Amino acid sequence: MPRPIEALIHPDALAHNLLQARRHAGDAKLWAVIKANAYGHGIERVWPALLGADGLAMLDLDEAQRVRNLGWRGPVLLLEGCFEARDLELCSRLNLWHVVHHDDQIGWLAAHKTHQPHRVFLKMNSGMNRLGFTPQALRSAWVRLNALPQVDEISLMTHFSDADSPRPGADGIAAQVARFVEATHDLPGERSLSNSAAILRHCERAEVRADWVRSGILSYGSSPDHPQHDIGHWNLRPAMTLRSRLIATQQLQAGDSVGYGSRFVAQQPMRIGIVACGYADGYPRHAPGDTGNATPVLVDGLRTHTVGRVSMDMLAVDLSELPAAGVGSEVTLWGHGPHGSLLPIDAVAQAAGTIGYELMCALAQRVPTHVQDLEPR
């Protein structure tokens, strides 16, 4: 039989999370962000849930082609725009919307021979300092785009750096909103400002809600402002479960160590379980398993923690308080466990010093992945 590890993808959880985004976004239209193969979940696996969105947003043309091949006829937005001039031909053929965030992209459009005008989102850098025109340069970019016969409607967008929580001494999104509104107040076109954190925390304000919101990490059941708020606070459901089983147990005596580097040393007699999961499966090698500083897991739905260093194919967990656990017991690394138990990916990520996004996207190809709705149909 194969190794007992598997990932389960829950499309109905994603559909539920998109409904929560809509509840916060009011009358704004909803982009479901599916970059990085739907944050590691697999576009095709979550496809039924995506039908509840108004548009699909991603990064590359391959993913755009995939959703068109799946039958999506609604708006598709390339969040980083075109990477070279020849991308415009496929944008035209697939009827893709694309972001314009630098001068070269305007030049490519000006030289492009198209059968139909392009729908673009002109991006302003309001403080994130990754992509976009400065407030001072935005109007000139808009004028140049508006003069091109290759361009149809021009929408406007920006991206928040601190929507999850304000930096000390800063004012969250207020300064970025003010810059965007001042620079665009007399320009026509739809607007898109809100990412996941802004949808949940700030969309009661009409200028933040605007015309389109972009639901990213919240769609997949991770809280964008964890640890301030967990998924229960936002009524989100994990759309991915990573689970395995115990394949061995060991009885330790005081002074015995566990794993490479002997990072964990038993202070008293204890029992541990060995789980068929390691960093080659996408579990973080740096997840701590030290005394007083360990990473949570569920065994048969009951919470315990890792011990020792994560290996390529295995990790160890503390069974001291779980006398019924043994070989074959189910281990939930994150997501939904048995008997209604739950281990949010954010809790694992926080212990490992990372974020849920990274764990989702790091799921290894060798892990068998199946689609399983949470609710019976």
Swiss-Prot record:
Involved pathway(s): Amino-acid biosynthesis; D-alanine biosynthesis; D-alanine from L-alanine: step 1/1
Biological process (GO), any one: D-alanine biosynthetic process
Binding site for substrate: 130, 312
Reactions mediated catalytically: L-alanine = D-alanine
Active site: residue positions: 35 (proton acceptor), 260 (proton acceptor)
Name listed for the protein in its UniProt record: Alanine racemase
Family: Belongs to the alanine racemase family.
Main function: Catalyzes the interconversion of L-alanine and D-alanine. May also act on other amino acids.
GO molecular function, one term: alanine racemase activity
Main EC class the enzyme belongs to: isomerase
EC number: 5.1.1.1
Listed SUPFAM superfamilies: Alanine racemase C-terminal domain-like, PLP-binding barrel
Organism: Leptothrix cholodnii (strain ATCC 51168 / LMG 8142 / SP-6)
